């Protein structure tokens, strides 16, 4: 249990998808103008990560890994080369389901996210979660915790950035840095702040 808690804390703070690996920057910068939209997208990313990483773990463990098909009498088959397209298919299917759900039950959030909701399908933070899971050889329980933690870490980062950007509307930003210029600087400073967690040994 302690290992799972440590993994969750590490994936949220020490190995933050947005501020440590700079994954998912497209939507991270585009949807961080308002806190409400950022929270909505953050929750969507948490849900997608929490489901796709464990599902992809099961697919890799029982179908794609070298020797995974031994249960089917095919111990020498290695389908790991199908990993990327399989993970993308799982992510795309889940995002499509979520898009239909939000369109039906939460239209305000659906309209606020706009084109960036289907773009979660190609959000490299989502794909990164599954690839890190395979690379680090997580088991199913670790995959659930890592998926939830990495999604929560990304949501925390985009919500914090949105809050800062809302406050910056009332700041006297130099003309040449207005818009994405000052946003990149803020993201860099946030990343430096999160680097302080790197000294924590878990």
Curated annotation (Swiss-Prot):
One of its GO terms (molecular function) is oxidoreductase activity, acting on NAD(P)H, quinone or similar compound as acceptor. Disulfide bonds: none annotated. It comes from the Bacteria. The keyword NAD applies. Its main location: membrane. Composed of six subunits; NqrA, NqrB, NqrC, NqrD, NqrE and NqrF. Belongs to the NqrDE/RnfAE family. This is Na(+)-translocating NADH-quinone reductase subunit E. It comes from Teredinibacter turnerae (strain ATCC 39867 / T7901). The lineage of its organism: Bacteria, Pseudomonadati, Pseudomonadota, Gammaproteobacteria, Cellvibrionales. The gene is nqrE.
């Amino acid at each position: 249990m302690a290992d799972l808690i440590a993994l969750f804390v590490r994936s949220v703070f020490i190995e933050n998808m947005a501020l440590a690996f700079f994954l998912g920057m497209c939507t991270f910068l585009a949807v961080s103008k308002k806190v409400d939209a950022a929270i909505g997208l953050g929750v969507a990313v948490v849900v997608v990560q929490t489901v796709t990483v464990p599902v992809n773990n099961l697919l890799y463990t029982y179908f794609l890994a070298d020797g995974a098909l031994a249960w089917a009498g095919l111990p020498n088959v290695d389908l790991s080369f199908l990993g990327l397209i399989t993970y993308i298919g799982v992510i795309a299917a889940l995002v499509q389901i979520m898009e239909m759900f939000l369109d039906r039950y939460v239209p305000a959030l659906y309209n606020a996210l706009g084109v960036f909701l289907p773009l979660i399908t190609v959000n490299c933070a989502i794909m990164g979660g599954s690839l890190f899971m395979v690379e680090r050889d997580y088991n199913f329980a670790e995959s659930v915790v890592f998926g939830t933690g990495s999604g929560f870490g990304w949501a925390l980062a985009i919500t914090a950035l949105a809050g800062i950007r809302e406050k910056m509307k009332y700041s006297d930003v130099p003309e040449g840095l207005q818009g994405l210029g000052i946003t990149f600087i803020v993201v860099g400073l946030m990343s430096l702040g999160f680097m302080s967690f790197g000294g924590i040994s878990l």
